A protein has these predicted regions:
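Exposed boundary/loop context
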Residues: 12, 25-27, 100
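Eukaryotic scaffold repeat domains enriched in small/polar residues
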Residues: 32-432
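Bacterial N-terminal signal peptides
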Residues: 18-30
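N-terminal secretory signal peptides that target proteins for export/translocation
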Residues: 1-16
Length: 432
């Protein structure tokens, strides 16, 4: 049995002093970003390794300002390039035409265009220089650009119809080479042999993120194979250009959510992702670090370029309540088909938590969360790759951030009244 020990006043004060210091340290640690605290996260995340929780009561003091610096509006060159017919009248536009944006060290801007299967090039002042590619199957031509990327001082574009990557010189813009890509080969994993697959993101010139799912979307309403009303899970792997899977499963995410309705005998459903519905989010940094998330949960997972899990970041938040009238008002008044869909479809009770994840050239995460504002606004968190908050700011939903480099944000902006889209560059100013 332990015996009590008598303490002098000096020793009591010494212990009390250190106890106070320890309490203060613990208080500070709990107020800042840290390891998961069971009281602030959902139960299913309690066993997730290396989980960092962003504490809402420890907002960073750094302020962020954006100064509009450049608007790309060379109408003679781009013509109807920004009029995105896939938006379906949605006020914040679609991205069907857009196949990525890259910026080189000299500030030249490269923009992929799926409609014309070309890459537009502008100098740092917004002057139109030229276009690369064009519709066709010859060297340097495309039939379906997935994305563009700068890697090893070259610009390359992946063509998902021809399964090949085309490389251009950053300086002269000359064609360098064309490489076949075999990501459509039967995978060397028994459990994935019969699963449809498609490349979804570029990691490097030889590595891709490829999705696999055990069933495709089936919109044949009234048949036994109809599944738009079901949740489909999608698995993601790192695959090289020879078609060999180079990773364990990176993540398993929920596929894009569909809402459906039958109106006057017509089966209606959304054809593309919408910000008020769940969708998988995948972002890859310039160095190949992979970030994944389901938009309906404020949890972002970080993976190495080989697919290995590193950590996860969780942002506790109350999700925005869904309001049918508010959603309908996001579409054009003459968009009868989507209005009918939204009037009659069963909608989720809440908006998703996230609308975007972007990685800047310094490896920082820019995470867009959906706010309670009546107008569609996003609250962006700027985080170190450790999860430490740097700054927050609010940004309109019609400004989609596509690239952050050299102290600038490059946004794809939709004119709400017309649906026309332009690329706008903003200078970033951070204080604090």
């Amino acid at each position: 049995m332990l015996k009590p020990v008598a303490l002098s006043n000096t020793k009591r004060q010494h212990i009390l002093f250190h106890g106070v210091i320890l309490f203060i340290v613990m208080l500070i640690a709990s107020a800042c970003t840290g390891q998961s605290q069971e009281s602030s996260i959902p139960e299913h995340l309690n066993n997730l390794q290396n989980l960092v929780v962003i504490q809402q009561n420890s907002l960073p003091e750094t302020s962020v300002r954006f100064t509009r610096d450049l608007v790309i509006n060379d109408n003679d060159s781009i013509k109807t390039w920004f009029n995105d017919v896939t938006s379906g009248g949605f006020a914040f536009g679609g991205s069907g035409w857009f196949a990525g944006l890259e910026v080189d060290d000299a500030g030249k801007i490269f923009i992929g265009d799926r409609y014309d299967n070309v890459i537009h090039i502008f100098d740092s002042t917004g002057k139109y220089l030229q276009r690369l590619g064009g519709e066709g199957r010859g060297p340097g031509e495309f039939t379906g650009i997935l994305d563009i990327k700068i890697h090893s001082d070259q610009l390359f574009a992946f063509d998902y119809f021809q399964f090949r990557s085309t490389f251009f010189s950053l300086d002269s813009h000359d064609l360098i080479e064309v490489r076949d890509v075999y990501t459509n080969r039967t995978p060397d994993r028994e459990e994935l042999r019969e699963w449809p697959s498609r490349p979804v993101s570029l990691i490097s010139d030889d590595l891709f993120i490829v999705s696999y799912k055990n069933e495709m979307k089936n919109a044949n309403y009234g048949t036994e194979n109809y599944n738009l009303d079901q949740e489909i899970l999608v698995r993601y792997y790192v695959v090289d250009r020879e078609g060999k899977i180079r990773s364990d499963m990176i993540d398993e995410l929920k596929d894009m959510k569909n809402i459906t309705a039958v109106v006057d005998g017509n089966h209606l459903f959304n054809l593309s992702p919408l910000p008020f519905l769940q969708q998988p989010l995948i972002s890859v940094s310039d160095k190949g670090t992979i970030f994944t998330a389901n938009s309906d949960e404020p949890l972002i997972k970080m993976h190495a370029s080989n697919g290995d899990y590193i950590k996860a970041i969780y942002i506790p938040m109350e999700k925005k309540a869904m309001d049918r009238d508010e959603i309908i008002n996001l579409f054009a008044e003459d968009d009868e088909e989507n209005t009918n869909l939204l009037l009659h479809a069963e909608l989720p009770e809440k908006w998703p938590a996230l609308c975007d994840i972007v990685i800047d050239d310094e490896g920082r995460l820019w995470v867009a969360t959906i706010t309670e504002d009546e107008d569609f606004m996003c609250k962006w968190w700027v985080l170190q790759d450790t999860g430490e908050p740097i700054a927050t700011f609010r940004w309109p939903g019609n400004r989609s951030i596509e690239k952050i480099k050299n102290g600038y944000v490059y946004a794809r902006e939709t004119e709400v009244s017309t649906g026309l889209q332009t690329i706008v560059r903003y200078r970033i100013e951070m204080d604090g």
